[in-house]
Curated annotation (Swiss-Prot):
The modification N6-acetyllysine is found at residue 42. It catalyses: L-methionyl-[protein] + [thioredoxin]-disulfide + H2O = L-methionyl-(R)-S-oxide-[protein] + [thioredoxin]-dithiol; [thioredoxin]-disulfide + L-methionine + H2O = L-methionine (R)-S-oxide + [thioredoxin]-dithiol. Residues 1-32 form the signal peptide. It comes from the Eukaryota. The active site is at 158 (nucleophile). This is Methionine-R-sulfoxide reductase B3. Catalyzes the reduction of free and protein-bound methionine sulfoxide to methionine. Isoform 2 is essential for hearing. It is an enzyme of class 1 (oxidoreductase). One of its GO terms (molecular function) is L-methionine-(R)-S-oxide reductase activity. Residues 47-169 form the MsrB domain. It comes from Homo sapiens (Human). One of its GO terms (biological process) is response to oxidative stress.
Amino acid sequence: MSPRRTLPRPLSLCLSLCLCLCLAAALGSAQSGSCRDKKNCKVVFSQQELRKRLTPLQYHVTQEKGTESAFEGEYTHHKDPGIYKCVVCGTPLFKSETKFDSGSGWPSFHDVINSEAITFTDDFSYGMHRVETSCSQCGAHLGHIFDDGPRPTGKRYCINSAALSFTPADSSGTAEGGSGVASPAQADKAEL
């Protein structure tokens, strides 16, 4: 009987890890919500229209899953009361009361206005596992969510300023238009 040949243990472990990561990436492309494939979104805009309406940075972040530079976004240090919305379709996402300074360099929130407004997708880019957040109405990339936020949720929605628009609260303390989706005619091109 000849001796059984096996791979050296470090190589065997490395191959097993690679196989697990590939399987996780393949299976992890599943998401909660239904709007990662732009064809299934409730609100759809042509790429031509989005390039006209959005700044180059807004387009890069929301349509190409880009990330703006840390500490340079319009809303990083923003403290006014109001509602933060998706810059692409106007869906209300976050209240200013849930915004906090995480020190990360991006606007951070510990809760969303409506849990159905955001889609969560596993993201295995850059050799790590994160959870991407996208607008569930139009599929715009917003940022990522982490489990290191403050109470009561323990969540940190780390969101690119370029993915947001802001509606200030009026004198009665409520934000204008906090419940609707902006039409393309209503959405102004925001300059960052």
